[in-house]
Design a protein with these regions (language model features):
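Helicase motor core with emphasis on the C-terminal RecA-like subdomain
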Residues: 1-10, 14, 18, 22-44, ...
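Short alpha-helical "packing" element that flanks the helix-turn-helix/winged-helix DNA-binding module
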Residues: 20-23, 371, 502
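Flexible coil/turn residues that form the inter-helical turn or adjacent wing/linker of helix-turn-helix
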Residues: 164, 378, 509
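Accessory DNA-binding and partner-docking regions appended to nucleic-acid-acting proteins
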Residues: 1-3, 337-338, 347-356, 363-365, ...
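Short alpha-helical segment immediately N-terminal to, or the first helix within
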Residues: 26, 301, 374, 504-505
Length: 551
């Protein structure tokens, strides 16, 4: 089986996305690679496809347990034998997994960076063939990056202890030129193929709101997006609790996540979001780096983040499936003081001397200034972000750049008029936000009427808008079936099939194996597992529609 056969058989795709094939070919040719690709561009396939074609094991160094669990779950559902090794497993489970790996049962093993430093894992690694080491979230290796993990600095020393140097591949979604240089140097990549596909996420609509009544805005937004999955980021635990209590009191299905909750609460709340039990989570920035949920339709920042890197990474959790999604930042001047406090009172990094600490503080304040400038600029928001990362968007006509997909480039008068109601706290409703049922019903009525204009730029559409009314009904049926299957097998719904795959099913209406395998995202293993039950659901739906028409 060649790379195209692997892509179709296991992952259900007929062709590679831009940039993927170049990296796959480089790895198969034995070259190191660095892929800087935006979230949702398909970084994981760049190492998973060659991993299945190489003779040995691929070790994927990943920073978060939840990310490993999701990736391994998705691979297993696709028919790929994979495992993860981290602190969530017992010693017996780790011993068993490594024994299976020695027997050749796993082609891909996800591992926490700290695990590389243990004697037991090193002993395993020196007695098996390791074809490739993949460093996921590679920006974590740089102390100048926003997610520095000291344990990433030990990856190269682990590589040097192996009998033979494997291919090293590294991937990240956000990397300034300084961080990129650190990745190349610290991992000691040899004549690497470096691919930057660009930072642009064309499916994301960016908005900045200068409003004071943030609670009313968020309540109205969620009422008008009841069917959508979303994340609301807050700078502090206190704000998370406040927003959660307000939305929960108004009858909205939400959950929360921050470091002040117990480990059990965090896991339960995270799972309720991932499994679509609670469509919206209110969280601090402790949430999300390990989340691979593909159908997040909006990300709202209740407070301004500390830097563009953090903002773009967090906002980028919307629309990972490539469908249109919104990223809204609610700005207030108080956010500047909060972030300055965090910068000036941060715990010292024991791996940095006083001079380096001082340089980092200066750098962080510059990053904060750039974030404030983003919130205040009247130029294109997308262009601002791309320029920050060293990329200049094409502008053939010259003059002011217009992306036609941000709040500065698309002036929506209805939306501006709606925003005026949020300019002053308590302007529309007495504080706290009303919990009266009649008031909430009135909000729902007004929000539904306003949703067509007040919360959407021309490009901001729901993915299912490509379907007619009956197609949307079928899509909702298939989504409910997907949820039931996901609960029964213990994986997130998007691991069964993405929204994009369900929409393609609704458009193609498959009735046999050949037709179902033509649906994007349906590989042979998933067809064997789920193809018949989804085709039966489609048939039952159409049969019911036919009987209704006959009456």
């Amino acid at each position: 089986m060649d790379k195209y056969g692997i892509l179709k058989h296991y992952f259900g795709y007929d062709s590679f996305r831009p940039g993927q094939e170049k990296l796959v070919d480089a790895i198969l040719a034995g070259q190191d690679v660095l892929g800087i690709m935006p979230t949702g561009a398909g970084k994981s396939l760049c190492y998973q496809v060659p991993a299945l074609l190489m003779s040995g094991i691929t070790l994927v160094v990943s920073p978060l347990i939840s990310l490993m669990k999701d990736q391994v779950g998705a691979l297993n559902q696709a028919g790929v034998h994979a495992a993860y090794i981290n602190s969530s497993l017992t010693d017996n489970q780790i011993t068993k997994a490594l024994a299976f790996a020695k027997q050749g049962r796993y082609k891909i093993i996800y591992v926490a960076p700290e695990r590389l430093e243990t004697w037991g894992f090193l002993d395993f690694a020196t007695h098996v063939e390791i074809s490739m080491i993949t460093v996921d979230e590679a920006h974590c290796i740089s102390q100048w990056g926003q997610d520095f993990r000291p344990s990433y600095l030990n990856i190269l020393s682990f590589v040097k202890k192996l009998a033979r140097r494997p291919i090293i591949s590294a991937f990240t979604a956000t990397a300034t030129s300084k961080v990129r240089d650190d990745i190349l140097q610290i991992l000691s990549l040899e004549r690497p193929v470096i691919l930057t596909t660009g930072f642009d996420r064309s499916n994301l609509t960016f908005k900045v709101k200068h409003i004071k009544d943030k609670d009313s805005y968020i309540l109205d937004y969620l009422v008008s997006h009841r069917q959508d999955s979303g994340i609301i980021y807050c700078a502090t635990r206190k704000n998370v609790e406040k927003v959660y209590d307000m939305l929960n009191a108004n009858g909205l299905s939400v959950t929360k996540y921050h470091a002040g909750l117990s480990a059990e609460e965090r896991k339960e709340n995270q799972d309720s979001f991932i499994y679509d039990i609670k469509p919206v989570v209110i969280a601090t920035n402790a949430f999300g780096m390990g989340i691979d949920k593909s159908n997040v339709r909006f990300v709202i920042h209740y407070n301004m983040p500390q830097c563009i890197e953090n903002y773009y990474q967090e906002a980028g959790r919307a629309g990972r499936d490539g469908e249109d999604s919104e990223c809204v930042l609610l700005y207030s001047p108080q956010d500047i003081m909060i972030n300055k406090f965090f910068i000036e009172h941060r715990e010292p990094n024991p791996d940095m001397d006083a001079e380096e600490q001082a340089r980092l503080m200066i750098l962080d304040k510059r990053r904060l200034n750039a974030m404030v400038d983003y919130c205040k600029t009247t130029d294109c928001l997308r262009e601002y972000i791309l320029k920050y990362f060293g990329e200049r968007p094409d502008n053939p006509g010259g003059g002011r750049y217009n992306c036609h997909n941000c709040s500065n480039c698309v002036v929506d008068e209805a939306e501006q008029e709606a925003d005026e109601a949020y300019m002053y706290p308590g302007n529309r409703f007495s504080a706290p936000v009303s919990r009266n049922a009649a008031m909430v019903a009135d909000r729902m009525k007004r929000s539904a009427a306003a949703a067509k204009s007040a919360y959407a730029t021309p490009k901001s559409k729901k993915p299912e808008d490509a379907l007619n009314d009956r197609g949307v009904m079928l899509f909702n049926r298939l989504r409910e079936l997907r949820k039931q299957i996901a609960v029964s097998v213990g994986v997130p719904p998007y691991v069964i099939f993405s929204d994009r795959t369900l929409i393609d099913m609704c458009l193609k209406v498959p009735f046999n194996e050949e037709e179902m395998l033509s649906v994007s995202g349906v590989g042979e293993n998933k067809y064997e597992r789920y193809g018949k039950v989804f085709m039966d659901e489609i048939y039952d739906f159409l049969d019911g529609m036919k009987q209704n028409l006959a009456r």
